[in-house]
């Protein structure tokens, strides 16, 4: 499998170059600009003291997310969904996926009655925007939680962050299992999966579809192994980003 050379020069089991730049938005309590090759997503975390009315008085916090693509993040300009007057099904689906993925690693009781909203805006799309959004949003979330602790909205001894979380795409392209699909690979994939994994290697979500021929159990296991190797590498990128000094927000 590793002998397969892809159009961009990668081997089948190789991630695209991944970078995470923290504090990209100095106004926000947490932010990260994440790049997976040509895919770039700005993830912004907004910390609010208080929770939605339906959660008030329960002593628990809330983490949610919104996903959007800029009009010229793709080859041809598309209208903003706000101009169309409705949010598309794909946008709803991805927003909910990001929110679920982040909530999987947050202790809502330790968070207290506080709300964190993650806005994930795709600046440039070249495949894997939802997986990049999850990977970058975790870093923005971690910084927002630290901001909440520093400003005494979260207890000094509380530990709301249970683990890290990252995500990657895998698929079968031209008969070969591949990691982290670029757009030109994604549109040709016979099987396409998005896999969300915690830092400890536990699965949060597996979204898999046979676009062409159905896949068997051994192919599924191979793709999951490929995804686990990819997310292990992504955890290292996240950890390095969070260990590096970053300027604080202005808020």
Swiss-Prot record:
Gene3D superfamilies membership: GHMP Kinase, N-terminal domain (3.30.230.70)
Binding site for phosphate: 90, 128-130
PANTHER family in the cross-refs: EXOSOME COMPLEX COMPONENT, EXOSOME COMPLEX COMPONENT RRP41
Biological process, per Gene Ontology: rRNA catabolic process; rRNA processing; tRNA processing
PROSITE patterns: RIBONUCLEASE_PH
Gene (name only): rph
Name of this chain's protein: Ribonuclease PH
Enzyme Commission numbers on file: 2.7.7.56
Superkingdom, taxonomy of origin: Bacteria
Record field: catalytic activity: tRNA(n+1) + phosphate = tRNA(n) + a ribonucleoside 5'-diphosphate
Family per record: Belongs to the RNase PH family.
Keyword Nucleotidyltransferase appears in the UniProt entry: yes
A single GO molecular function term of this UniProt record: tRNA binding
Ranges in a coiled coil: none
UniProt keyword annotations, A-Z: Nucleotidyltransferase, RNA-binding, rRNA processing, Transferase, tRNA processing, tRNA-binding
One Pfam family recorded for the sequence: RNase_PH
Organism, scientific name: Leifsonia xyli subsp. xyli (strain CTCB07)
């Amino acid at each position: 499998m590793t002998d397969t050379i892809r159009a961009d020069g990668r081997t089948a089991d190789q991630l695209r170059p991944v970078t995470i730049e923290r504090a990209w938005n100095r106004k926000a309590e947490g932010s990260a600009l994440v790049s997976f090759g040509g895919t770039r997503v700005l993830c912004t975390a907004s910390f609010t003291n208080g929770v939605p009315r339906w959660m008030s008085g329960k002593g628990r916090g809330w983490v949610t997310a919104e996903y959007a693509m800029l009009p010229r993040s793709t080859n041809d300009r598309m209208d903003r969904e706000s101009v169309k007057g409705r949010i598309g099904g794909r946008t709803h689906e991805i927003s909910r996926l990001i929110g679920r993925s982040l909530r999987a690693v947050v202790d809502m009781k330790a968070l207290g009655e506080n709300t964190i909203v993650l806005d994930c805006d795709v600046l440039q799309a070249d495949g894997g925007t939802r997986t990049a959004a999850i990977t970058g949003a975790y870093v923005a979330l971690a910084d927002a939680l630290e901001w909440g602790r520093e400003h005494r909205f979260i207890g000094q001894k509380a530990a709301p962050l249970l683990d890290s979380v990252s995500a990657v795409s895998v698929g079968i392209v031209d008969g070969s299992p591949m990691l982290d699909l670029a757009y030109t690979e994604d549109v040709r994939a016979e099987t396409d999966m998005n896999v969300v994994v915690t830092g400890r290697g536990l699965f949060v979500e597996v979204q898999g579809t046979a676009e062409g021929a159905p896949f068997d159990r051994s192919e599924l296991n191979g793709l999951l192994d490929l995804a686990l190797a990819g997310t292990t590498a992504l955890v290292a990128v996240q950890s390095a980003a969070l260990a590096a000094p970053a300027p604080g927000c202005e808020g």
